[in-house]
Design a protein with these regions (language model features):
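Short histidine-centered loop motifs in beta-beta connectors
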Residues: 84, 94, 109-133, 157, ...
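Single-pass alpha-helical membrane anchors
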Residues: 2-32
Length: 170
């Protein structure tokens, strides 16, 4: 082996080891973020839970009507599970009595809005300032619901509903 080939081999080995270390640490960081409920985009998850109904077209579980649009994701949690604000913001809406039962909408500092429905207890009022991680409510089974869960929505600054799974639960 020539000196040039030896240096090339050593350099390539060093690059491969460095790349392996970076990949290993990225996986560890992603695992820790997932365990803590955090995401790489700066959001935290309002609750760590299994997604039981995805964003998009589906069969309505209450009516059986096909091709209805589900504007958020459903997260399976027992009634009384603490719900946290995923990012700082201002409580824009607190309401009850509709299909979502007890609901909250928060406008966040990045222009996005998050919505929370079927809550058993709301701990904030309209105009409240919330910090990331603040306890805002407890999950429940109010409104048009088939069982205890959190219906979680994400609205872009343009006003269009987007899939929370892609941005916060990925």
């Amino acid at each position: 082996m020539t000196r040039k080939q030896l240096y090339w081999s050593i350099g390539l080995t060093a690059v491969m080891i460095t790349a392996g270390i970076i990949i290993y640490h990225r996986k560890r960081i992603k695992k820790k973020l997932t365990e803590a409920g955090d995401t790489a985009e700066g959001w935290i998850r309002p609750v760590v839970a299994k997604i039981t109904s995805k964003f998009g077209h589906r069969t309505d579980p209450k009516t059986g009507k096909t091709n209805t649009f589900h504007n958020g994701i459903d997260l399976a949690v027992p009634s009384g599970t603490p719900i946290k604000s995923p990012m700082p913001g201002i409580v824009e809406t607190v309401q009850s009595g509709g299909a979502g039962g007890n609901e909250i909408i928060i406008k966040h500092i990045n222009g996005y809005k998050t919505g929370y429905a079927h809550l058993s207890k709301v701990l904030v009022t309209k105009g409240d300032e919330v910090k990331q991680g603040d306890l805002i409510a407890y999950s429940g089974n109010t409104g048009k619901s088939t069982g205890p869960h959190l219906h979680f929505t994400l609205t872009a600054p343009t006003g269009v509903k987007v899939d929370p799974q892609k941005m916060i639960y990925s």
